[in-house]
């Protein structure tokens, strides 16, 4: 009881008895990553007492891993694939396969920036002014290489947190910190001197896993669905009814992926129109559609877009 017969046919890939080991970033990206997987079709359920969330897919096993360490574990083969930032791939110099870019973060669907920050009244105006200075950052390896490539000698020390405060309190001359908008930095009386790195989330995989045809196929399927979920966040669907004699005027307003779908209604003088548009365009587009003669306008969110 409870076991499949020897010749049972299953719908899962041949490697189902050895599931893919997927790393979910623990910490600031955790909630956003689980939400992205949910939109893509996978329900991941974390547990308070361990680091191994449940997932409703027998071909995958999950582990919560710090984003800073993810690339190292994927490179070793401890994990087959995982999600982490480009910044931590570069920091660890891990040899991994980058499957796809997924531009999302804890608070938005845009990249983050590692920036050089100094107190507002600091004499440092450019990166070259860092010669002989003391810099605090969590991204030590990358920062040292960045400066070395430009022939700048400076002391770079690891920061365990509250990095911005070190610059405010005068403990260091500058910090290299991550930000999405820069608002917190400015609120602390600090000034951004330069952007050092634009970073976003990457789905990475172990080279051995990618060399296996079945595992590679499954990894690429996961990537496809995650990208489809992210793409859908930027778009909405619009449906409306349009008088036949005003169709051309309405269609001219639509920045569609392709030509909009137009179908006939029972009343031959009216047509139904459906299209996909940028979510940010709707606030201006709907009033324009109304003015052009469209009626019964409906807007609805998309879950995936391939």
Please provide the spans of the model-predicted regions.
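Short, structured active-site "lid" loops
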Residues: 59-80
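Small-molecule-sensing regulatory modules
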Residues: 11-59, 64, 84-113, 121-306
